């Protein structure tokens, strides 16, 4: 028996996450990952990623998915849904079969990149090749990469349909179809495209649908396309137990002052601030920068490469504050985020649920603060009723134990997400470099010196603007907490505000 488990002693395990967790992830049947009879290479990746025991959604979904049955799963944000479908996907893939065997569809590029990174992390020993394809990127690069071996295709609906229609992506042997954020995927924006994509898959494929909310459109899709699905519902309550929710009643022109007060009093590890429009995202990011805080921003109107850079740097903790639209409300898992602020109160309960779910990930603690004005009061009551939760008035002092981990070093740093196109370009450059070196060695044998291959730097990457010295002095004069004393990035990426958009009239 000891010989069977000897491989565990050779694993490169990360530092254990000692932060307290809630019943959202602890209320399990007591199973372990070994109980699912997964292949050893997959277990190695699971343990090296820091996974210890399966969460409730993983415990329910993994063994059923491995048997090949369709699944319709509903669970809270931040409880391990991604691993719940990635693990059975990796278990079912046959590395020696050079075909696309699994298709994972997600609504945004950021979520696609994150999902692919989970696949690469958990499947690092499995020999599985994963490719990401999304709109807004070079189609030619995708076509070239599909000439190589791809086992798992992760993408957004439009680009996947484009590649399948061109017969570049061969889905004829794709036996597994996964939809994350199924409620969004089956909205009017994507439903027709999803229906078309399914025509390229074999009829006898397995379908896994995961989401936190299931509207009528999902049920209609289930009746039409799923065969006797196993239904999982772990939503006794909609909001995560580890998130404390407050509202602050302020006039519109006082919101920025209130935000500044929160920055000075809260112990923020990382924070996401949501606005309801792209113009307000950019303007608020500029205002926060003017106050002397480091700040990035992201919204759907930005260039794709800029969004990628923001997402990557924020995940790596290079800045504490991110201002964004609802672009990042779905699926984005950054465990260092412990505070979410709704600078603009959302219009629907669904949006509110996804926004505050960016904190308190995987059963940990988080804080959600809503800045509301007179026009938001009825919406606040409506969302409380729909979600069955209470949003209390913000107290004068917020207990740090509600949202701050005792040991900050226990917060796991995510594995860097590399843009697949940059990875492909780097691989091609390395191949060219090797070819040139080989030619150079042959040339030296023939009597002329070989030339060293030169790899040019990546072009078009957004740069930070210089930091004015007065902002650093302002930090010290205002007595800001140590965690906020850092050089601010000037409204990342540097762009001009819309013409005629006067800040004083809004705040």
From Swiss-Prot:
Reaction equation(s) it catalyzes: ATP + H2O = ADP + phosphate + H(+)
Alphabetical list of PROSITE patterns matching this protein: DEAD_ATP_HELICASE, HELICASE_ATP_BIND_1, HELICASE_CTER, Q_MOTIF
Record-linked SUPFAM superfamilies: P-loop containing nucleoside triphosphate hydrolases
Motif (DEAD box): 180-183
Cell compartments where the protein resides: Cytoplasm, P-body
GO cellular component: cytoplasmic side of membrane; cytoplasmic stress granule; P-body
Biased composition (Low complexity): 430-452, 466-488
Physiological role: ATP-dependent RNA helicase involved in mRNA turnover, and more specifically in mRNA decapping. Is involved in G1/S DNA-damage checkpoint recovery, probably through the regulation of the translational status of a subset of mRNAs. May also have a role in translation and mRNA nuclear export.
Full protein name: ATP-dependent RNA helicase DHH1
Organism annotation: Candida glabrata (strain ATCC 2001 / BCRC 20586 / JCM 3761 / NBRC 0622 / NRRL Y-65 / CBS 138) (Yeast)
Recorded name of the encoding gene: DHH1
């Amino acid at each position: 028996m000891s010989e069977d488990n000897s491989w565990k002693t050779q694993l490169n395990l990360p530092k254990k996450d000692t932060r307290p967790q809630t019943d959202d992830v602890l209320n399990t049947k007591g199973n372990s990952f070994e109980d699912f009879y997964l292949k050893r290479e997959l277990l190695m990746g699971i343990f090296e990623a820091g996974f210890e025991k399966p969460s409730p959604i993983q415990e329910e979904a993994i063994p059923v998915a491995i048997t090949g049955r369709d699944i319709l799963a509903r669970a809270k944000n931040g409880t391990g849904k991604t691993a719940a479908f990635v693990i059975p996907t990796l278990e079912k893939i046959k590395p020696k079969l050079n075909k696309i065997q699994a298709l994972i569809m997600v609504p945004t590029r950021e979520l696609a990149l994150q999902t692919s990174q989970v696949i690469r992390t958990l499947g690092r020993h499995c020999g599985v090749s994963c490719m990401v394809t999304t709109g807004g990127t070079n189609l030619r690069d995708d076509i070239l990469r599909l000439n190589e071996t791809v086992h798992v295709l992760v993408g957004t609906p439009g680009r996947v349909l484009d590649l399948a229609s061109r017969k570049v992506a061969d889905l004829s042997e794709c036996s597994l179809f996964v939809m994350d954020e199924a409620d969004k995927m089956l909205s009017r924006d994507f439903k027709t495209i999803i229906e078309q994509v399914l025509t390229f898959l074999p009829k006898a494929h397995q379908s896994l649908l995961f989401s936190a909310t299931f509207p009528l459109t999902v049920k209609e899709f289930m009746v039409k396309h799923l065969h006797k699905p196993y239904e999982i519902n772990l939503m006794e309550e909609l909001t995560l137990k580890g998130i404390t929710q407050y509202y602050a009643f302020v006039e519109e022109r006082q919101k920025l002052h209130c935000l500044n007060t929160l920055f000075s009093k809260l112990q923020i590890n990382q924070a996401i601030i949501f606005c309801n429009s792209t113009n307000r995202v950019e303007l608020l990011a500029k205002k926060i920068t003017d106050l002397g805080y480091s700040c990035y921003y992201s919204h759907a109107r930005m260039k794709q490469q800029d969004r990628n850079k923001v997402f990557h740097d924020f995940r790596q903790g290079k800045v504490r504050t991110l201002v964004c639209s609802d672009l990042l409300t779905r699926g984005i898992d950054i465990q260092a985020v412990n505070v979410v602020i709704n600078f603009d109160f959302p219009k629907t309960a669904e949006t509110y649920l996804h926004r505050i779910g960016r904190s308190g990930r995987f059963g940990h603690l988080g804080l959600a603060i809503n800045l509301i004005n007179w026009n938001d009061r009825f919406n606040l009551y409506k969302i409380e009723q729909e979600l069955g939760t209470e949003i209390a008035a913000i107290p004068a002092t917020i207990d740090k134990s509600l949202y701050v981990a005792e040991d900050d070093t226990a917060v796991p740093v995510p594995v860097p997400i590399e843009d697949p196109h940059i990875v492909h370009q780097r691989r091609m450059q390395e191949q060219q470099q090797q070819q040139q070196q080989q030619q150079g060695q042959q040339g030296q044998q023939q009597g002329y010196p070989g030339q060293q291959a030169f790899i040019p730097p990546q072009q078009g990457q957004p740069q930070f603007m210089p930091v004015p010295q007065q902002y650093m002095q302002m930090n010290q004069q205002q007595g800001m907490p140590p965690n906020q004393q850092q050089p601010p990035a000037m409204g990342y990426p540097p762009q001009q505000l819309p013409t005629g958009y006067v800040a004083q009239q809004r705040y």
